[in-house]
């Protein structure tokens, strides 16, 4: 996979949108480990998201893998995106997913890669099951920055990075505050 979009998250006390904002917990402890390790978490009761630890051990910051282009294993990624499809219609259903949508968004990306909770803490730089390799450079003029998607605290921080014009980049969605129900009178 060639990454096309990421979001950065700072360490304790720095970034209110980060899982480490209030310090180390059993859930976020991987983010305090060495760089190059995968921090995987379950969100909204239905999706996994994957972050790559990016600062020295003890720092507690990572980069959310938001979107990418599947460049190898396209058929496998398609099948993973259709986990409940089977039978004679499987191939037809699998082909309906446009290439650009296979890993467009953090949950789709983890499904396309086959990332699950058991990958939490995996070393992506030294031969683990999920590996990161340097790809072809993107000209700096094609890299854009802006506010992170869907976060409320720290929403104004321009730590979302994407390749301009890349069709695999997920659409920007500003955080929409939840409407609280009115108290009964």
Give names to the regions the model predicted:
Residues 1-185:
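Conserved, well-structured core segments that form or line functional sites
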